[in-house]
Design a protein with these regions (language model features):
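A short glycine-rich, Lys/Arg-flanked "PGG" loop and its adjoining helix->strand segment in the class I
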Residues: 67-83
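A short SAM/SAH-binding and catalytic strip from SAM-dependent methyltransferases
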Residues: 49-65
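Active-site micro-motifs of SAM-dependent methyltransferase domains
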Residues: 38, 58-62, 113
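Conserved Class I S-adenosyl-L-methionine
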Residues: 97-131
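A short acidic, Gly/Pro-enriched loop at the edge of an enzyme's catalytic core
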Residues: 37-52
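Hydrophobic/aromatic residues located in beta-strands of well-ordered beta-sheets
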Residues: 19, 84-86
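Short strand-turn motif at the edge of the Rossmann-like AdoMet-binding core
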Residues: 9, 87-91
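Class I SAM-dependent methyltransferase SAM/SAH-binding core
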Residues: 5-40
Length: 131
């Protein structure tokens, strides 16, 4: 039997039973202490079936290079058809604007730039929408 992991990345104090809870700080008894801007992540290729990123992505990857490395790591550790659940504040909401720890707005369009099917479609049709 192959058992795939479920990760709660950047969990902070939101420890979820049945998930490997990962955070940069070990303030809340996390399962794995790891900085999500440090590569590679301590997980095998294709070993994860689900990832929760709840109000995490807007806090990491300030430089485009680091942000792209983060997405590449998620791709590397996820098995085919893995589910990644992303929760983020709206970039125009006061909570996003007023929080100095928010380093980048995350939008659906911005994330769609990394969807393989869309990139192949854009490549085929000619528009320069790929990163």
């Amino acid at each position: 039997w192959i058992i795939f992991m479920k990760l709660n990345l950047g969990c902070g104090n939101k420890i979820i039973e049945g998930y490997v809870n990962v955070d940069k700080f070990d303030l809340y008894n996390v399962n794995v202490k790891h900085d999500l801007e440090t590569f590679p992540y301590p997980f095998e290729d294709d070993s994860v079936k689900e990832i929760i990123l709840s109000h995490v992505l807007e806090h990491i990857g300030q430089s485009p290079e680091i942000f792209i490395k983060i997405l590449k790591e998620l791709y590397r550790i996820c098995k085919n058809q893995a589910l990644i659940k992303i929760s983020i504040p709206h970039p125009r909401h006061d909570n996003f604007i007023s929080d100095p720890t928010h380093v980048r707005p995350i939008t659906i369009f911005g994330l769609s730039l990394f969807v393989r099917d869309l990139n192949e479609k854009w490549e085929k049709n000619g528009p320069a929408n790929t990163p």
